[in-house]
Amino acid sequence: MKINYMFSRIDRDKGFNDNQKKYIKEDIKNNMSITFIASLFDEYERNDTQVKEIVNVFKNIDINFKEVHLIDNRVSKEDAYKYIEKTDIVYLMGGSPELEMKSIIEYNLFNILRDRNGITIGTSAGAMNQTDRVI
């Protein structure tokens, strides 16, 4: 089953609103795996901080992940592909849609992301990059 969540942003202080919680808790269960794809592959500190904050938002609604991976320039293209193949959830992070898509294409992840079943979450740029056309 293919499920896409698209957010303009997630409030890292307040977390998910009640409507978001309802659907997220229906689809995302404890001990799933999640793989984040950065929009800015060279911004390591930013990426690490955002992943920790987003994982905490899920923890606040009692969802804990068995594995958390982050794809940016510290990860080889081969490992990035393996993470996507095996993960339950892909999370496309916010930032620059153009740079995120450039990195997705450079890492040869476009087809596997497009064709995979599972849950894909995107905020801002990550939401835009889930669509066929952004104007």
Residue ranges with predicted function:
Residues 1-89:
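N-terminal beta1-alpha1 cap of cysteine-dependent amidohydrolase-like domains
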Residues 12-13, 43, 97-98, 127-129:
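Glycine-rich nucleotide phosphate-binding loop and flanking beta-alpha elements
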Residues 89-93, 121-122:
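Structural motif
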Residues 99-135:
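Class I SAM-dependent methyltransferase SAM-binding "motif I" and its flanking Rossmann-like core
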